[in-house]
Amino acid sequence: MEKLAHNYHALRGLTPYGTKFMGLVKADGYGHGAVPMAKKLEELGADYLGVASLDEAIELREAGLKLPILILGCTPALYAGELVQYNITQACYDLEYAKALSAQVQKGGGELCIHIQCDTGMTRLGFLCQEDCQDRSAREILEAVKLPGLKAEGIFTHFAQSDTSEEATMVQFDRFLAIIEKVKALGYTFSLRHCANSAATLLYPATYLDMVRPGIVLYGHLPDVSMDPGLCDLQPVLELKSRVGTVRQVPAGAQVSYGGTFTLARDSRLAVLPVGYGDGYRRAFSNQLSVLFDGQKAPILGRVCMDMCMVDVTDIPEVEEGSVAILYGSDGKGEQSVEMAASLPPATISYELLVTITKRIPRVYL
């Protein structure tokens, strides 16, 4: 937990005094465990939490979290009553949805806090904010925020290329500022304007506005491997480890695992680890990735199974049943980073490797 605290303070140090901080804990806290991460962020002084769905938000409320929670994804208007009941803020992405939310809230009573979502170039959700759409969208946003039962606290957008293109990001940012000004000219001012995701928090201070929304960087990973690690002193929060189930002597010529994709060229000692793609350890790692034993690399041989994988410890004689293998992380003598694993073909991103670690793997918080 001290690494999460370290990253939080490092990111807070980038923002001016008074800038609010939304910590994203969607996808089970990027695989780290949403409730423990959220509780730590609340303790550290975060102002808001961000999730993707109603179920994620309710999980936090039922765990005792008091911070404001914004659902960034779609929640059917039918569940407006639950949004009000649990005091959850909902992203509102078009006028028809706003009207549906308003109608449902009026049936059940109360008031629903919303943040207006603007599509400035992500092409996913939001009022269209390209230059030829802005006047119409400003009028629709004004109509939405005046609907009964809705309290329009904030307005936000999401950058599509903030980790790779400053030009594209500034186009989106300019569109966002323009729509805010157009709505203001029509008579409505938002108290929270936010657009800075992880990459923008590191790269573009101009985009901080009233609140930043760090996600992957909170957990110690850069949004893109090409980014300069010197932008912020981040520490990976998670290490993935497994203990050796057994060690077997296997003769030369034996084929290892499903499909016989690896044939032993020598008599070998194979350590069996009780972790596989059923735990989120990718099948694509087969015959490509290594694990660490006290700084020494033991390559995965053969295909990663659903529940197990085999690694070659012939040259690491001290490995025995119960020895600890580091799958992602560092032991001070060597490192097996999530980014390194993600770069193996077919390449993916650190986000995917983290969020696909399944519930079968227990989380231990230190």
Protein language model regions, located:
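Active-site-proximal beta-alpha core segment in soluble small-molecule metabolic enzymes
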Residues: 1-6, 13, 17-194, 208
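Active-site anion/phosphate-binding pocket segments in diverse small-molecule metabolic enzymes
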Residues: 1, 5, 13, 56, ...
